[in-house]
Design a protein with these regions (language model features):
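Short, basic, alpha-helical segments at the C-terminal edge of helix-turn-helix-like DNA-binding modules
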Residues: 40, 70-76
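Hydrophobic alpha-helical segments that form the core
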Residues: 152-175, 183-195, 209
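Helix-turn-helix
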Residues: 21, 25, 29-63, 67
């Protein structure tokens, strides 16, 4: 008589834990399929639950998108905050932040892939939320720059320059460039930010110490 194989019982999670699991699966789905195309059914399949279970936490696709983008934004902001070393010299602080940004593409690739996709949604409903995140990141970098150049009229531009370079860092990680090439780009990125921060009276950048 053939032996019956029992299926393992499905783990029953607390609502908060189940929601966190679904959001994590949704981030992975959004990374694979794109913000505009990922569905509740794909999330359910990845999580191993019924589609109705996903709908019980996210009534509409818009609710799911909001949860995913909130999670992505929170992860990126947390990375930036953790990378900040207030006592470090400015060049060192920026270099550390750049390295952490590049490493995030390796450690949390799905989060970074969603972030890159999010940055292309210029005409979509998600665009204002993306600009809000960019504003948060620029404000954090601006605060770092202001520690040594509080009166610089170029604080905003220098912060934009640095945050913009973060996209290139992520793409270079996904391209799997060499460590030497990545380090060279980070050095140039930091140097360019500092040069933009300290123009002389003629408008030309001053040498960066």
């Amino acid at each position: 008589m053939p032996t019956m194989t029992k299926r393992p019982a499905r783990t029953r999670l607390l609502p908060a834990d189940r929601r966190a699991q679904l959001v994590a699966c949704a981030v992975a789905c959004f990374a694979d399929h794109g913000i505009a195309r990922a569905t509740q059914a794909q999330v359910a399949e990845r999580a191993g639950v019924s589609v109705s279970a996903v709908y019980s936490y996210f009534r509409t696709r818009a609710d799911l998108v909001t949860a995913v983008l909130d999670a992505v934004a929170a992860a990126i902001v947390a990375m930036v905050e953790e990378a900040d070393v207030p006592a470090a010299p400015l060049r060192s602080a920026l270099s550390t932040l750049a390295h952490h940004t590049a490493d995030m593409a390796v450690e949390q690739p799905d989060t970074v892939r969603v972030w890159l996709d999010w940055s292309t949604g210029v005409r979509a409903d998600v665009w204002p939320r993306y600009l809000l995140l960019q504003g948060q990141l620029q404000a954090h970098v601006r605060a770092i720059l202001a520690r040594e150049a509080p009166a610089s009229p170029a604080l905003n531009s220098a912060a934009r320059l640095f945050v913009g370079g973060a996209h290139t860092l992520a793409l270079m990680r996904f391209e799997q460039v060499s460590a030497a090439e990545l380090a060279l780009f980070i050095d140039q990125m930091v140097g360019g930010t500092l040069a933009a921060l300290r123009p002389d009276s003629s408008g030309m950048p001053l040498p960066v110490p």
